[in-house]
Amino acid sequence: MTTETLTQLEQHELFIRRHIGPDSADQQEMLNFVGAESLEDLTQQIVPESIRLGRDLAVGSACGEAEGLASIRKYADKNKVFKSYIGMGYYGTIVPSVIQRNVFENPGWYTAYTPYQPEIAQGRLEAILNFQQLSMDLTGLDLASASLLDEATAAAEAMALAKRVSKAKKANIFFIADDVFPQTIDVVKTRAECFGFEIVVGPASEAVNYELFGALFQYTNHYGQITDFTELFAALQEKKAVVTVAADIMSLVSLKSPGSMGADVVFGSAQRFGVPMGFGGPHAAFFVTRDQHKRSLPGRIIGVSQDTRGNRALRMAMQTREQHIRREKANSNICTAQVLLANMASFYAVFHGPQGLKIIADRIHRLADIFAAGLKAKGVELVNNTWFDTVSFKVADSAAAQARAIAGEVNLRIDSDGILGVAMAETTTREDVAQLFDIVLGEGHGLDVAAIDADIIANGSNSIPAELVRQDAILEHPTFNRYHSETEMMRYIKRLENKDLALNHSMISLGSCTMKLNAATEMMPVSWPEFGNMHPFCPQDQAQGYAELIEELSNWLVDITGYDAMCMQPNSGASGEYAGLLAIKKYHESRGEGHRNVCLIPQSAHGTNPASAQLAGMKIVVTACDKQGNVDMEDLKAKAAEVAENLSCIMVTYPSTHGVYEETISEICEVIHQHGGQVYLDGANMNAQVGLTSPGSIGADVSHLNLHKTFAIPHGGGGPGMGPIGVKAHLAPFVAGHAVVKHGRESDNNGAVSAAPYGSASILPITWMYIKLLGYQGLRQSTQMALLNANYVMKKLSAHYPVLYTGRNDRVAHECIIDLRPLKEASGVTEMDIAKRLNDYGFHAPTMSFPVAGTLMIEPTESESKAELDRFIEAMVAIRGEIAKVEAGEWPADNNPLHNAPHTMADIMDSEFDSRPYSRETAVFPTAAVKANKFWPTVNRIDDVYGDRNLMCSCAPIDDYK
């Protein structure tokens, strides 16, 4: 009989062993190799004593996966999922099961990274290109981005673009029609305040009365009215104003496109194309503009180029606009967007096709027609006389109607002026309309849905004016017209998935990206309807489960970070930076020090830091780093003193972007505080802090947390993300507010930074599960294992490559940088060559040329096993041997496995391959491990220059499919 106790047999800590890659025997072998007795010994060697936490986290003990699911189920059950007719940018939708199972719930799609290595990302690049094509077709404009965070932040980006491209250079007014969604107005006002723009909100027709650089309109508007803006847009453009339009994606299937009315920019949420409401997100925003504004477009763009064989290949285009290159001069700070959700929306369009989408749109419109006709027949006053899906109206006894709605588990839109609204959706049925009649009119109204439908068919409907009915064809490309059976759709999705390398194939060791395990159990609650089908503006007593989950998660994160409060609204890391800087800005203003507008940023900082500071209206002063990669304290002190009167803050990452725990971090905080500034500690590297130290204990005032890095939300191929901010008590009154949902914690004048009050709320259960399952023991062990894995890889590779920076005791933190510049000088082999050659070995390349050009930054995370680390090390050592052959002249510098990487099936089938100085086996099966688990890149190295010089960001011409 076993002598283990029942507690031991219950295995409450089993998930810790599931999450952490190396088992205890492997851990000891690795510790022996790096020269440490234990994980605690290694921790003490690496983490400066002055900042060690010295206590257990107050997040509870680890628990089993079934126990964790049972716990979160209690929260889900407290959410009351009413039928929602609120609309306002969030609608019921049906996620096709083939997409839910094969994309949304498939690690081949949700664990991939942003496609910076396009040769191993052709599948999701095609899906995103489809999203761009969909966006362009529906809006009637030329060039679309790969997705933005949500409709409201897209509106803020549209305003910024308008200012950049408007020829009305002296104008400083941006006009917003007063029937734009209130959350959008809120977010735009927040951004405008930072830029110093004047916002005027008024009736759309009054826009021509102002000298503007841009204007924003909603199509269809908050009340459901459809307006032909053609003449107004022309009048505004005559005055050199840039016209931007927030549009409903489903309505555009049926309505005249804003582009054909003359709009310059069109954006909106793609949520109702098969993505659940999720209490606010995540959802992809589309953003489309004219070709002449392409250099000013925010976010990523997928473009068509060619590979070295001249074959069509996809890549991210015009990256010189983006924050990781242009920093404070970038068009936007956006980095992570909403790629997974954009892919879902594009697959939704592919699966239904233009005819299927038209049927869905027509059904939604017919239900709105029936509802409106019934109300009019009973003498109800309608607010709008045109509509696609939304009918607004007034009733004599609004309170009684609202009471009947709640009793029937129905949510109507209730405006402050007493107007009620009903927005039909894909999920709405004829039975729902009958119930709505009962709610609005009371019993005994005598209306019959079928009879009204027959009358509409017989007599027609003028709710969409004839001149606003879409006449042009949409989605004519073969991709949108051939995958309408589930068999074909399933195979199309799988065919694209097979082109991409994600975590379900091999380690992705991207430094500063923390590509750790996204456990299946953590992901499961995201699919539950109790979380997915909640409208973000529903009465708060219906979202009690969300409220309690968010409160508990906030308390855990407060304890982990050492801060006093959390704000969950930012829906990306870059959005979190912006929100944190706004809190600092408002704090200074509250003290009569609004002139403090200088942000110090070390030269090693992430590109989002200066881009976010610029968005927040700050002036950037760069501080130097010393030869060891640390912040140069003398330079910092000198510059802090120089700008002391205007010093707002410093943005600093910890551990540093160079992968070490800087000994002077607390001193950095003290210097800034002495000069009246605040400390923004970038949370990108929190995976080396959790349970060992914390931003609050170090001395920082505010941080964002990348929940899609440290806290297990998957990267989704480029989003979704979540970037909540933690703040000290003095900054808590200045975090983001919301125009629609009041939390009661922040000041009334705090603007929103995202469309929804809790950002992408439906993915917060992933982080809740991560912390719940690991507990305080597992969180600390995970951080320690991240350190061990990084130091193991560093020491193994240091015999073959120079390691650029180390900290105390020649250790690194959770990532290391290898310096390829000496090898490049000696052999001509570039960091790009090595990155592409790793594709042949079945690996995604580490982070390339950041934070130092000519380097690779490697972050293995705690989730990778010793076997996988050894396979990666074997690949890197083998590549070093290949470089040696180039150095020795055995292989020509312009014809070797590195220069020609990656290799495809077409290469080894090519009869001319024999002219190469290396074998086919060397090209594609360089090690036994590769033979056992081969990943095939589907294109050769892509020509970036060709792609930017011949910009094409739409699906291939139809002739390519013949």
UniProtKB/Swiss-Prot annotation:
The modification N6-(pyridoxal phosphate)lysine is found at residue 709. Its cofactor is pyridoxal 5'-phosphate. It comes from the Bacteria. This is Glycine dehydrogenase (decarboxylating). It comes from Shewanella loihica (strain ATCC BAA-1088 / PV-4). Its EC number is 1.4.4.2. SUPFAM superfamilies: PLP-dependent transferases (SSF53383). CDD domains: GDC-P. Transmembrane segments: none annotated. Belongs to the GcvP family. The keyword Transmembrane does not apply. One of its GO terms (biological process) is glycine decarboxylation via glycine cleavage system. It catalyses: N(6)-[(R)-lipoyl]-L-lysyl-[glycine-cleavage complex H protein] + glycine + H(+) = N(6)-[(R)-S(8)-aminomethyldihydrolipoyl]-L-lysyl-[glycine-cleavage complex H protein] + CO2. The glycine cleavage system is composed of four proteins: P, T, L and H. NCBIfam families: gcvP, PRK04366.1. GO terms for cellular component: cytosol; glycine cleavage complex.
